[in-house]
């Protein structure tokens, strides 16, 4: 009898215990494109290293494949800000989230390859995150392959990064979200305001007149057509702090400005035919509201069905190399000095702009062509 009671109690305890609680792990990565020794990291003194926080979900096991969310931080933050209980508190806010959450370092880099007088380097964040980090994640973790299972989101500067990266890898990311994002970066007040934050606009995006093409090629609002087949979630505050939260003059002013960014982007994305969920809310530019934004986006659902391989798309870029819906391209001799447009409509592939480019189709042999071109598939 006693043995039977002990066995029954053990069975109850086993049934009540979770399979595995979520687990936060930190990776240190290397890069050919970003030198951590040259960076000014945000937050307390920390080693000069490119670190990534990875939140493994409840019940994680490497024997099955998982969805993935890339979660980007803002201008004054670091790779550990989303996981910090005082800031993003992601483990609590997204408790029960059904996928892996990858939170990389972005310093104050704006998630772009810095113009730097035309070198497009020093640092090249886009190359690090898209060409090095994503492949590293997929080598180390069993990630589901279809684009519906790949999402990206971010706050403020990270909102710009999330929508920009989604625009440059539309065949990879099925969903993208911006929380108080800087997502309409060619508004008249932008360059002068940008220069007050510590970086020079000319270094990051180029001179607003002489390198307007480079600036344009990183503006999510202008690139909205790239996101036609991407599920989009955009949320922003109204610049008014809730009575229960502390007031913050900078946070109020910043959110008022970024509210217009959200309006600009949402209008452009809807005009392009994208599926946009736009949620203007109460609040200012501060962590209590971003936690709410993330929780609401989780309820919206990062991994709902998304079109896998549309035969009708437009892709604009200033990148020297990239991937447009599985059509990998690399410009020969020199990088573009204008916004390049690739498009597919049924059985016809087109390229508009100038330059010589090598293109590798998803299925087929590499070919080299001079722009502009039209090629029947």
Give a label for each model feature.
Residues 1-6:
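Bacterial N-terminal signal peptides that target proteins for export
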Residues 7-15:
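Bacterial N-terminal signal peptides
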Residues 18:
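Family-specific functional microsites
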Residues 21-358, 365-370, 374-377:
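Non-catalytic cap/lid and distal C-terminal segments of serine-dependent acyl enzymes
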């Amino acid at each position: 009898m006693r043995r039977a009671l002990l066995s029954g109690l053990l069975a109850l305890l086993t049934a009540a215990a979770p399979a595995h609680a979520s687990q936060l792990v930190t990776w240190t990565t290397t890069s050919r494109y970003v030198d951590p020794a040259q960076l000014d990291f945000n937050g307390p003194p920390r080693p000069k290293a490119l670190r990534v926080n990875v939140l493994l979900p409840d019940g994680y096991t490497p024997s099955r494949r998982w969805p993935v969310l890339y979660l980007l931080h803002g201008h004054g933050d670091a790779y550990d800000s989303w996981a910090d209980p005082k800031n993003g508190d992601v483990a609590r806010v997204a408790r029960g989230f059904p996928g892996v959450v990858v939170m990389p370092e972005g310093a104050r880099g704006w998630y772009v390859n810095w113009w730097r007088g035309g070198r497009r380097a020093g640092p090249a964040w886009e190359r690090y995150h898209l060409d090095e980090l994503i492949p590293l994640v997929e080598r180390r973790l069993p990630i589901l392959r279809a684009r519906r299972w790949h999402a990206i989101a971010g706050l403020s500067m990270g909102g710009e990064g999330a929508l920009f990266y989604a625009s440059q890898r539309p065949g990879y990311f099925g969903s993208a979200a911006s929380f108080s994002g800087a997502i309409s970066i060619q508004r008249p007040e932008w360059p002068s305001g940008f220069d007050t934050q510590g970086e020079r606009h000319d270094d990051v995006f180029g001179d607003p007149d002489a390198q307007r093409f480079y600036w344009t090629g990183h503006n999510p609002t202008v690139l909205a057509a790239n996101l036609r087949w991407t599920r989009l979630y955009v949320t922003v505050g109204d610049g008014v702090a809730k009575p229960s939260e502390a007031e913050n003059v900078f946070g109020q002013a910043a959110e008022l400005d970024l509210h217009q960014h959200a309006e600009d982007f949402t209008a452009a994305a809807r005009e392009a035919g994208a599926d946009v969920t736009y949620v203007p809310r109460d609040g200012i530019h501060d962590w209590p509201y971003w936690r709410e934004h993330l929780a609401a986006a989780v309820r919206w659902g990062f991994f709902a069905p998304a079109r896998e391989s549309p035969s009708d798309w437009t892709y604009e870029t200033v990148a020297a190399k990239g991937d447009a819906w599985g059509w990998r391209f690399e410009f020969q001799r020199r990088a573009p000095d204008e916004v390049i447009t690739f498009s597919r409509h049924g059985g016809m592939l087109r390229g508009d702009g100038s330059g010589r480019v090598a293109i590798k189709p998803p299925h087929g042999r590499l070919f080299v062509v001079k722009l502009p071109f039209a090629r029947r598939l």
